[in-house]
Amino acid sequence: VVALLAVVAAGCGSTKKSASSSPPATSCEPGHLNLIKKGQLTIGTDNPAYNPWFAGGTPKGSTWKFNDPTTQKGYESAVAYAVAKQLGFASSAVKWVVVPFEQLFRPGAKSYDFDVNQVSVTPARKKSVTFSSSYYDTNQALVAIKGTPITKAKSIADLKSYKLGAQVGTTSYDYIIKNIKPDHQPSVYNNSNDVNSGLKTGGIDGIVVDLPTAFIITGAEEVPNSVVVGRFPVVGVGDHFGAVLAKGNNLVTCVNQAIATLKANGTLKQLQNKWISSAANAPLLK
């Protein structure tokens, strides 16, 4: 009997270890997911939400200042709903909540299952949150006003004497500090509207942003008479956008499976072609 109990105990211990390291196939069904609210997928993003990541305007009564994510338009909104579908959720079971960018990395409980907000995956951020695999890869670019001296820049060295700006807490700001290393301390702004205003009013000579956003700023004339001066070389592993989850949330396994499927079946590529401008012709600033 003792021997039999030992065998049973050993079997139970083995099963528990296996479940921890390798979730069963059914674990990604809605009923098995680690969610804020059962039966509902809660997704966070900032307010306002910006093109090309969110689009479609703001329906009457919406919480969002513009580009309500529930329209399913814009790259990140479309990706979020595609992930939700892979996880077994109908669109009606998806709820969006407002999460300011600067609050994403604070410790403690989260109000969302995952957040999409053009968040670049970095080692420092991984200390406080869990990231999904990448759903978009990009590099940094420079935007300036047409005809200004900075637009003649052909290299990173040509930018040393100019005043640059970026949004707080972004890899764009880090790129300025670590790679461009201008003579002047770069200006830091709370959101993209403030960054754009800095360029419009002449407070800065140029904006550093991810390349798709650079083409939206210029193409949609968010900053009138602006131009993409060029794109910067990828340094290290490059810039990857990942969904943000609470630190250690095992939901990431299922989100990663969904993203892998969307990559394999061509959905991510189709959504990029639909919502994000081509950046092939941007000159490289070495």
Predicted segments — roles?
Residues 7-11:
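C-terminal motif of bacterial Sec signal peptides marking the signal peptidase cleavage site
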Residues 12-21:
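Bacterial lipoprotein signal-peptidase II cleavage site
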Residues 23-116:
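Extracytoplasmic small-molecule ligand-binding "clamshell" domains
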Residues 43, 48-50, 70-87, 119-121, ...:
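Bilobed "Venus flytrap"/periplasmic-binding protein-like clamshell domains
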Residues 79-82, 86, 148, 163, ...:
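Extended ligand-binding regions for polar small-molecule ligands
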Residues 92-158:
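Acidic, polar ligand-binding/catalytic clefts
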Residues 136-144, 219-257, 278-286:
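Periplasmic-binding protein-like
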